[in-house]
Regions:
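PLP-dependent aminotransferase class I/II
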Residues: 1-147
């Protein structure tokens, strides 16, 4: 680590408690807003764990929603909410494919991957941005709800 990187890290670490507090506030709003949305599976909160809340993942419930993750993702983008997809099953990467690993080896991991995405969660998010994200998620869950 260079001196410059260390100086940047030092100044950022001083902000960490404030950042964590804000992430907890946003996470609490999301948890409350989505608790009764059957089209979603939410991350389980562990009361004794204190996390940095790096991501807020949602998983589409395939039994309750009529769209793919790609459709939901694109619809969120159309609502001006940028989502991300993370955690590709590691054995899908070329290195592991070259070692003989193939898609289908871990069907549960692939099923979960096919429905997960993260919604915005960052310390500088305004309350209005949080509300807009909640509104977009709930609107699309209602729109794509299986009848």
């Amino acid at each position: 680590m260079t001196d410059f990187q260390a100086a940047l890290l030092s100044s950022q670490l001083k902000k960490l408690p404030k950042f964590q507090k804000r992430r907890k506030e946003i996470t609490a709003r999301y948890n409350e807003a989505f608790a009764d949305v059957p089209q979603l599976f939410l991350q389980k909160e562990i009361p004794t764990a204190d996390t940095t809340r790096h991501l807020y993942m949602i998983r589409l419930n395939p039994e309750r929603i009529s769209c793919s993750r790609a459709e939901f993702f694109n619809a969120m983008s159309a609502e001006n909410v940028q989502c991300q997809v993370h955690y590709v099953p590691v054995y899908w990467f070329p290195y592991y494919q070259a070692m003989g690993y193939e898609k289908g080896e871990c069907p549960r991991a692939e099923e979960i991957y096919s429905g997960i995405m993260s919604i915005p969660l960052y310390p500088m998010m305004s309350d209005e941005d949080v509300s807009d994200t909640i509104h977009a998620v709930k609107k699309l869950c209602a729109y794509y709800a299986k009848k």
